[in-house]
Amino acid sequence: MKFLIEDNIKFMQQFSIYHTSNELFLKAILRLIEKCYYSNFKSVILTTDVHQQEMLNKNLWTYSRKQFIPHGSKFDPQPAKQPIYITDELQNPNNASVLVIISPTDIAKILQVKEYIKVFKRIIIITDLLENLKELIIKINKFTGQENKIDCFTQNPIGTWNKIA
């Protein structure tokens, strides 16, 4: 990976965009969170608002019948000990290496907070709006100063991912 020096801040991140349908949206989010957890990646899940945050929190409690996925939110004690931390604010209390951004309404606004973004090694964006895909890629490329460094996946109707870029 290359380093890009911009405003004296080094960026070395892997960006991935996952596009899914509205019908599979929640299931896709839960599977990606589960994959982060089982890969031993501490993660921050950035939601659009407190309602989405609580919906994810509630669904993670009942998602897997096999094993509980430990997680917490800003309403829970000991955020530093949570492997999965769900929030609607730009926080990283668990020293996560992965940032999962769900349905970003303004990705440019999030990316502009460079001191926040630079601490993550991997940034995953999940969206159900196909028309935003090209716009997301342009904004990320502008942020990183690199082109074609973004992995893009789309989910087919049976739930598997196909790499599109």
Curated annotation (Swiss-Prot):
A biological-process GO annotation: DNA replication
Pfam families from the UniProt entry: DNA_pol3_chi (PF04364)
Chain segments annotated as coiled-coil in the UniProt record: none
Catalytic EC class: transferase
Alphabetic keyword roster: DNA replication, DNA-directed DNA polymerase, Nucleotidyltransferase, Transferase
Enzyme Commission number(s): 2.7.7.7
Cited SUPFAM superfamilies: DNA polymerase III chi subunit
InterPro entries: DNA_pol3_chi, PolIII_chi_sf
The UniProt record lists the keyword NADP: no
Keyword Nucleotidyltransferase attached: yes
Catalytic reactions on record: DNA(n) + a 2'-deoxyribonucleoside 5'-triphosphate = DNA(n+1) + diphosphate
Domain of life where this protein originates: Bacteria
Molecular functions per Gene Ontology: DNA binding; DNA-directed DNA polymerase activity
Described purpose of this protein according to its UniProt entry: Part of the beta sliding clamp loading complex, which hydrolyzes ATP to load the beta clamp onto primed DNA to form the DNA replication pre-initiation complex. DNA polymerase III is a complex, multichain enzyme responsible for most of the replicative synthesis in bacteria. This DNA polymerase also exhibits 3' to 5' exonuclease activity.
Similarity section: Belongs to the DNA polymerase III chi/HolC chain family.
Subunit structure: DNA polymerase III contains a core (composed of alpha, epsilon and theta chains) that associates with a tau subunit. This core dimerizes to form the POLIII' complex. PolIII' associates with the gamma complex (composed of gamma, delta, delta', psi and chi chains) and with the beta chain to form the complete DNA polymerase III complex. Interacts directly with the psi subunit (holD). The only subunit of the DNA polymerase III holoenzyme known to interact with single-stranded DNA binding protein (SSB).
Protein name, per record: Probable DNA polymerase III subunit chi
Recorded name of the encoding gene: holc
